[in-house]
């Protein structure tokens, strides 16, 4: 199964137009991001402690919900 990080990278963009693209760009720059994780709780805890680049955890929640629908539910 594709990790959340791998899924999120499809939203990277040199000129981000939305919060998820900003998140993807920042996660790419975050060398400690749990790149292999598929677990909501693990990612959420990491971002709460280290995700100062997120304007709101809602952005993560929305991205993870999309990931859950598109990848995990297959």
Curated annotation (Swiss-Prot):
Membrane spanning residue stretches: none
Domain of life: Bacteria
InterPro entries: UPF0346, YozE_SAM-like, YozE_SAM-like_sf
Family: Belongs to the UPF0346 family.
Protein name in UniProt: UPF0346 protein BPUM_1890
Organism (species): Bacillus pumilus (strain SAFR-032)
């Amino acid at each position: 199964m594709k990790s959340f990080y791998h899924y999120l990278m499809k939203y990277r963009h040199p000129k981000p137009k939305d919060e998820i693209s900003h998140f993807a760009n920042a996660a790419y720059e975050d060398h400690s991001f749990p790149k292999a994780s598929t677990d909501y709780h693990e990612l959420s805890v990491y971002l709460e402690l280290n995700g100062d680049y997120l304007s709101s955890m809602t952005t993560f929640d929305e991205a993870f919900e999309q990931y859950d629908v598109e990848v995990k539910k297959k």
